Amino acid sequence: MLPVRSARNWLTLRNSWLLLRNAGRRSFYSTKPKAPRKDELPSFTKIALVGVVGTIIFAEAVKSLDKNQPKNSYSESEYAEVVKNMKRRKVMFSPGELKVQIAVQGVNPGNFHDRGRIVEPFEVAETYRKMDNDRYQPLLNDLRDTYGDQYVQNLPQGLLVMLIGRYLKDTCQKGDSVLVVDFPLDMSDAIKFENEISVVDKVLFNSPEADSDLAKYYQTVNKVEIL
């Protein structure tokens, strides 16, 4: 006689085998097996599909994140390409298209001879302030009402650079020489002008301003002329 535990295990195995055999017979002898509805896929198929779709979505999300990640390091060639693309996208005048010189505030107008067409910031601002329906006319009028003839010194940061660039584009032709006087007003304008408008060939300073931060900035690229 089998022990009780062994007998129970044997009965369990036997019953399981009989159930599987009977289930197989019912499936084999059924003449019209019930087809699953098209919208009722087997659970394992659903799981597989969810897995595939989830993987695709995740992969695309990773790609998206990868594209939007800020790049913190560049090789020398990559950096050169970035700078090249920035210049192609932003600079209004390509190098050599205009010969641009600048005379900071305080330079004697007697030094302006034979340096090309004179461009004054006040003249530039007045051109667009008096232009009907210009998008900057209301702002320039408000500033003129508030500050009078000194309103050019009180323009929003960067606006004077943009207006001068626009004025040069509207009035100059390729190969022209221009001297922008009483400019830049600060270091920010100096950097913005060369980054977005044009490379500067020379910057004129009086002797007292030779040690200014602005002069030192232009000295790093050998563009300073002391008068």
Curated annotation (Swiss-Prot):
Keywords: Membrane, Mitochondrion, Transit peptide, Transmembrane, Transmembrane helix. It is a single-pass membrane protein. It is found in: Mitochondrion membrane. The keyword Zinc-finger does not apply. The chain crosses the membrane at residues 41-57. One of its GO terms (cellular component) is mitochondrial membrane. It comes from the Eukaryota. Residues 1-35 form a transit peptide. Belongs to the AIM36 family. This is Altered inheritance of mitochondria protein 36, mitochondrial. The gene is AIM36.
